[in-house]
């Protein structure tokens, strides 16, 4: 799918071999698609971590654990887009989360980072029912 999606085939190198227990970015090709649990085995550092709209689908303890592994990789910048107020709560008739994760949670969990900017209007989105899809930018503390 990925190879077929890019016109410049020469620039697309996809990691298609099985990686060892622990691995670094040097073991990866330009594009690597790994299951989320493999973040625990990744060694090294990154410049930018991006999460768009998936943290809001998880329970807070899962996000906190994931972020602990992201912080271990010491990205210089973090870019998040999620619902500021959190995902709707699950009910007997509606899907949702058991406990919402909000902007305050992200700021607390990314303890090695400082707030740069938050915006719903620039590149974010406010739904008709008042939920705010927020773009949040953090940078590593000196």
Predicted regions and their residues:
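Short, flexible/disordered intra-domain loops and linkers
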Residues: 87-100
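A short beta-strand submotif of the Rossmann-like class I SAM-dependent methyltransferase core
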Residues: 51-54
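Rossmann-like AdoMet/SAM-dependent catalytic core
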Residues: 36-48, 97, 101-142
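Short, conserved loop/helix-junction motifs that constitute active-site signature segments
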Residues: 43-44, 69-74
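A short, conserved alpha-helix within the catalytic core of class I
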Residues: 57-70
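Conserved beta-strand signature within the Rossmann-like core of class I S-adenosyl-L-methionine
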Residues: 74-87
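S-adenosyl-L-methionine
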Residues: 2-42
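Flexible loop/turn segments at secondary-structure boundaries
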Residues: 40-41, 57-59, 86-89, 124
């Amino acid at each position: 799918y990925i190879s077929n999606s890019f016109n410049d085939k020469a620039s697309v190198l996809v990691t298609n071999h099985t990686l060892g227990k622990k691995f670094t970015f040097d073991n990866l090709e330009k594009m690597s698609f790994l299951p989320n649990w493999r973040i625990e085995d990744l060694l090294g550092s990154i410049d930018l971590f991006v999460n768009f709209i998936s943290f809001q689908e998880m329970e807070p303890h899962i996000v906190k654990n994931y972020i602990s592994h992201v912080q271990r990789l010491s990205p210089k910048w973090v870019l998040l887009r999620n619902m500021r107020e959190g995902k709707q709560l699950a009910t007997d008739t509606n899907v949702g989360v058991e406990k919402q994760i909000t902007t305050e949670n992200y700021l607390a969990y990314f303890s090695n980072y400082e707030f740069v900017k938050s915006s719903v209007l620039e590149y974010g989105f406010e739904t008709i029912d008042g939920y705010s899809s927020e773009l949040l930018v953090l940078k590593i503390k000196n």
